[in-house]
Amino acid sequence: MSIVVTGATGHLGRLVVHQLLEKVPAEQVTAVVRDEAKAADFAARGVKLAVADYNRPETFDGLFAAGDKVLLISGNEFDKGRVGQHTVVIDAAKAAGVALLAYTSAPGSLTAALADDHRATEQVLLASGLPYTLLRNGWYHEVYTENLAPVLAHDAVVAAAGAGRLSSASRADYAAAAVAVLTGEGHENQTYELGGDEAWSFAEYAAELSRQTGREIAYNSVPGETKLGILKDAGIPEPLASILVGVDASIAEGELVISTGDLSRLAGRPTTPLAEAVAAGLKG
């Protein structure tokens, strides 16, 4: 039996693999990667590597084995039919008879277009008959704290979210939840709504940035069309920019406030405070 992690060299995947290695022997972990060279550090620690690509279904033939636990980390290629990509993995997992397939989805409360592929993937997974766990991940601190250059250049946080609040958490928090599911028992056919312990507004985020930098950083709430133009001017492709503006609209409606406590319970600790993520982002 192996614990198999797809997208293992991505931001979340790397954290999952590293945290798995704190709990299970390396030979029980398989990292699915597109580029073996990017996973050399995993191989050096004894992790098994499997080279496969969501866009090449044949590369998943025989990759899984009966009894495996699989983490399907959602793809980030918004223009390549993510549902089809995910279905490739689900079909291969079903053919192998895996013991569990956990999928990193989106909050059940999210109505933004970002959620569409996740909802469709969930339906494919449920229809497969596989034992499943839906890890409905909320928003990541790092979406904001790893992109501070424009904020610091203009002394302003800009969002089309009004006074809306969100309960984000760090990638490491979501990774810890996934590891708990992959290494624990009793998670079959469960859905977890995952978010940070504390909700915050963009005005509060700007205030925290001001506190840590000693500068006056404002929050500018703008219409969605204005935010779309800003993102496109920054070189973000329109499809992704539109998705991000849609998320802002969902934040304005409170759709990214997740108050279940599922994330901290699975992680076995409180979630990472926003202030800590801001400090890390400022250090670069």
Task: Spell out what each predicted region is.
Residues 38-45, 62:
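Short loop/helix-cap segments at secondary-structure boundaries that form the rim of catalytic
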Residues 44-47, 130, 215-217, 268:
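A short helix-to-beta-strand connector/capping loop
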Residues 225-284:
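A hydrophobic C-terminal alpha-helical subdomain
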Residues 43-55:
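Rossmann-fold cofactor-recognition segment
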Residues 59, 69, 276:
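Residue-level recognition of oxygen-bearing side chains
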